[in-house]
Design a protein with these regions (language model features):
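Non-catalytic accessory regions flanking glycosidase/transglycosidase catalytic cores in CAZymes
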Residues: 1-226
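Conserved small/polar residues in nucleotide/adenosyl-binding loops
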Residues: 228-230
Length: 230
């Protein structure tokens, strides 16, 4: 076997963003319940987080974790997962055909990330919801005080904002399996407006768009081109 090596001094090797090596946690199977959160487990701490899982995540040195999904996020009402656990509603999860008890939500995830020494990446629902709900979540997590959503966070027992910097705008929105699936143009419009309003709420954040979910998709390639014209 012969190999050819081409050296070109004009090309520079860029620094790889460590976030590429991140992971995500979704309300799917035993990922959350029975995975990272299991109050009755022998290693569970005062928050119900499994200590053995946290130790393993620390060993992996995971730089960032996305939450709450995944397909799950496209039908998720983030408000269901904050406040007193006993008052949180149970919802049908159409993504995975289960019932979501909402024992574990936004604030629990933030606390888990701190214990696991990893950064939070939040995903917002752009399937069944939109820009207003997305910017409200940014206000809840990142605004210090003096507004309805930030004061609600404080009422829930979290005086300081979580200061989440990276936000994912939906999940696999080109897929027919996704709740609220969209064309590239439809997604581009809602993503643009959501990102704009989220950054008006907190100018320090970054937002991440959805690309094609699969090379086997009929819109692969055209999805990115169509979105670029928005």
């Amino acid at each position: 076997m012969k190999a050819k090596i081409t050296l070109a001094k004009e090309f520079k090797i860029g620094e790889i963003d460590k976030r590429i090596y991140g992971s995500f946690i979704e309300h799917l199977g035993r990922a959350v319940y029975g995975g990272i959160y299991e109050p009755d487990h022998p290693t569970a701490d005062e928050d119900g987080f499994r200590g053995d899982v946290i130790d393993l995540v620390k060993k992996l040195n995971v730089p960032i974790v996305r939450y709450p999904g995944g397909n799950f996020v496209s039908g998720y009402n983030w408000e269901d997962g904050v406040g007193p656990v006993e008052k949180r509603p149970k919802r049908l999860d159409l993504a995975w055909g289960t019932t979501e008890p909402n024992y574990f939500g936004t604030n629990e995830f933030m606390k888990w990330c701190k214990k696991a020494n990893t950064e939070c990446m939040m995903a917002v629902n752009l399937g069944t919801r939109g820009a207003d709900e997305a910017r409200n979540l940014v206000e809840y997590t990142n605004h210090k005080s003096g507004s309805a959503w930030s004061d609600l966070r404080k009422k829930h027992g979290y005086d300081e904002p979580w200061d989440v910097k990276l936000w994912c705008l939906g999940n696999e929105m080109d897929g027919a399996w996704q709740m609220g699936a969209k064309t590239a143009t439809e997604y581009g419009r809602v993503a643009l407006e959501a990102s704009k309003m989220m950054k008006w709420t907190d100018p320090t954040i970054e937002t991440v768009l959805c690309g094609s979910s699969s090379v086997n998709s009929k819109t692969f390639g055209r999805w990115e081109i169509g979105r670029a014209h928005v």
